[in-house]
Amino acid sequence: MTTIPKPVTRIACFRFKSSVTPEQKGDRARAFLGLYRQHQDLIVAMPVGGKPLNTPLNLTNVKRDSVWDLGFIVSFKSEEARQQFDKEDGHGKLKEETDPLLEQVFVYDFEEEENLGW
């Protein structure tokens, strides 16, 4: 019996250094989209995302990190596709160009699971 590969969803958020200009942030966003455009065979659809909204949470004793500059979600066709994307030369080059501009990165990859995995 053959198993159907599960899509892998990636959530990525970026906090740029304070010295990074809006133009540089826009350039990095275009670079990310360009890389995904080159590898549409590995993804379900192009990434979606944007700048954060200032949504009040009103949670007790919960710290909220509100200084992200950019975030997006993308779904890969499978774990194999995600691994292939991460190994692409263009991905490595993009990281080399972008990492010096970043203060912090959050990347969370997951396969959809019943009851959120628990």
What do these predicted regions represent?
Residues 1-70, 77-84, 110-118:
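Short S/T/G/P-rich N-terminal loop/turn motif that feeds into the first structured element of a domain
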Residues 73, 82-104:
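Short, compact, well-ordered microdomains
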